[in-house]
């Protein structure tokens, strides 16, 4: 039947390398069992080897390259934002020099004069249209009034 020493409570799945039940063998990164017969466990993070030094150097180089790239990207973003701000300032800026004031006042006068001319042309064209309508009405009235006047004279 069941083996007396193999209860579910007493047997627990764990790491075969270090014996720690908190993780499985493929997840073991921190500890190594020095002697499989004894319960002595060695912390890998406290030990150093030549391979790890080389790996650390490579990691440091890679991290430095990544930091440089990130810094360059940030600088580019800052420059672009500064350029945008400069463009906005140029658009908003109004110049206060006397020559530009004269130019702007001349331009304003010219625009005002153009608007007045357009208004005059529109009003003239409207007047012309009204005159034509009035002439047509007068002609109709003359034609209609002449027979009426003749009718009154006949009676």
Swiss-Prot record:
Compositionally biased region (Polar residues): 146-155
GO annotation, biological process: mRNA processing; RNA splicing
Entry's induction text: Down-regulated in the brains of Alzheimer disease patients.
Zn finger (CCHC-type) location: 13-30
Entry keyword set: Metal-binding, mRNA processing, mRNA splicing, Phosphoprotein, Zinc, Zinc-finger
Chain positions with Phosphothreonine modification: 146
Composition-biased stretches (Basic residues): 85-94, 107-142
Region Disordered, annotated ranges: 44-155
Modified residues (Phosphoserine): 52, 96-97
UniProt feature, compositional bias: Basic and acidic residues: 66-84
GO molecular function: nucleic acid binding; zinc ion binding
PROSITE patterns: ZF_CCHC
Subunit field text: Interacts with SREK1/SFRS12.
PANTHER family named among the record's database cross-references: PROTEIN SREK1IP1, SREK1IP1 FAMILY MEMBER
Function field: Possible splicing regulator involved in the control of cellular survival.
UniProt name for this protein: Protein SREK1IP1
Organism: Homo sapiens (Human)
Gene responsible for this protein: SREK1IP1
């Amino acid at each position: 039947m069941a083996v007396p020493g193999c209860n579910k409570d007493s047997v627990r799945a764990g790491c075969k390398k270090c014996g720690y039940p908190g993780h499985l063998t493929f997840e073991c990164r921190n500890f190594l069992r020095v002697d499989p017969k004894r319960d002595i466990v060695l912390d890998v993070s406290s030990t150093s080897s030549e391979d790890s030094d080389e790996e650390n150097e490579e990691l440091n180089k890679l991290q430095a390259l990544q930091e440089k790239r990130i810094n360059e990207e940030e600088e580019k973003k800052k420059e672009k934002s500064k350029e945008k701000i400069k463009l906005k300032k140029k658009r908003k800026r109004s110049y206060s020099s006397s020559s530009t004031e004269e130019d702007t006042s001349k331009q304003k006068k010219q625009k005002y004069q153009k608007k007045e001319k357009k208004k005059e042309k529109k009003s003239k064209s409207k007047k012309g249209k009204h005159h034509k309508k009035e002439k047509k009405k007068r002609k109709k009235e003359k034609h209609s009034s002449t027979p009426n006047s003749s009718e009154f004279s006949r009676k």
